[in-house]
């Protein structure tokens, strides 16, 4: 979660983007906290303005990104990082309806599933952070079964890696 967001924000800054907005998921989730921390660290390291108005939170459900997008576009963002797949789809549709062209009028980085339609259709116009969703589901199922079989076993953490894919790659 951390490294792909950090790299993507630094890449946007390197392209000349100055006001990079961030839409995170639910603030209480560890993945959201980690992604926001990566965004904030990258913004600071790249010498960009640190402005809380550039960070918004959706609820990771359908129709939760639109109000965030309205607010971020009012802040004159020239790039957006959307840290959740469903909100990413909504963002692409919203920007299209507003007449904004990805990669020209606004830069976009989104979390997507490897086989998502958004990744397939727009990977040449936006940066993608590809999540191994099948492996996430498989691993979660295995951990649940292990917990049922051995409820007193010590807890452990398994980290699966997302892949950062700059546009056109």
Role assignments for model-derived ranges:
Residues 19, 50-54, 102-108:
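Short acidic capping loops at alpha-helix termini that bridge into adjacent secondary structure
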Residues 16-21, 51-52, 71-79:
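Short, surface-exposed connector motifs at secondary-structure boundaries
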Residues 33-34, 67, 93:
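Generic recognition of short, well-ordered alpha-helical segments
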Residues 1, 32, 84-85:
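Helix N-cap/beta->alpha junction signal
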Residues 40-63:
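Short beta-strand elements in bilobed, periplasmic/extracellular small-molecule ligand-binding domains
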Residues 71-169:
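Flexible loop/turn connectors
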Residues 1-22, 37, 62-69, 88, ...:
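Hydrophobic alpha-helical segments within soluble ligand-binding/sensing domains
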Residues 7-47, 152, 156-169:
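An alpha-beta-alpha
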